[in-house]
A protein has these predicted regions:
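Cofactor-binding active-site loop characterized by glycine-rich and histidine/acidic residues
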Residues: 1-110, 122-141
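Thiamine diphosphate
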Residues: 107-182
Length: 182
């Protein structure tokens, strides 16, 4: 966020988390995290509702580059979308991931990196052992990699590899990130 003059990322996050009227996205109407100036797609408390938006943006970026259209975003932009392991089973998330696989299967450019933050607990219930890994890794035409969030060097290497793949090959990928819930 430091690269955008006048941005106040810490204040913006705190204003969002407290539903402050100073929140630049919601104006205090809802706890929403996002930023137009920083190109952060708003993420709401409705689980998985932002995945279709991320898919749509990646689809539009892919189409714009192929159609030689102008865009306010760099042509090598990558959409990054994080979600929790409980969201991986929500209909909106499943729909976005399936649409991503469908487009990738057809060779359509879709520069999106999905990051599943898996702490093994879906809101208040345990996620079935192995379910998230199996369902995410089985999506056709989507690159899948897992990393342990408690091992930052390994995580950084995996994340950089996937981001570079998405950026250069313009196809979707999933980073399945094992995390710890405090």
């Amino acid at each position: 966020a430091r690269q955008v003059a006048g941005s106040t990322p810490v204040a913006d996050v705190l204003n969002s988390a407290t539903a402050s009227m100073l929140d630049p996205i919601s104006g205090g109407r809802h706890k929403v995290f996002g930023s137009v100036g920083l190109n952060v797609i708003p993420q709401t408390s409705t689980i998985g509702s932002h995945l279709p938006r991320a898919f749509g943006l990646a689809f539009a970026l892919g189409r714009a580059a192929g159609a030689d259209m102008t865009s306010s975003w760099p042509l090598d932009s990558v959409v990054v979308c994080s979600f929790g392991d409980a969201s991986a089973n929500h209909s909106t998330a499943v729909g976005a991931l399936n649409a991503s696989a469908y487009c990738a299967h057809q060779g359509l450019p879709l520069p999106v990196l999905y990051v599943c933050e898996d702490n093994g607990i879906g809101i208040s219930t345990k996620s079935p052992a192995g379910w998230v890994a199996r369902s995410l890794s089985s999506l056709p035409a989507i690159e899948y990699a897992a990393a342990d969030g408690t091992k930052p060097i390994e995580l950084l290497d995996t994340a950089q590899r996937l981001a570079e793949l998405v950026r250069t090959q313009r196809r979707p990928a999933i980073l399945h990130l094992k995390t710890v819930r405090f």
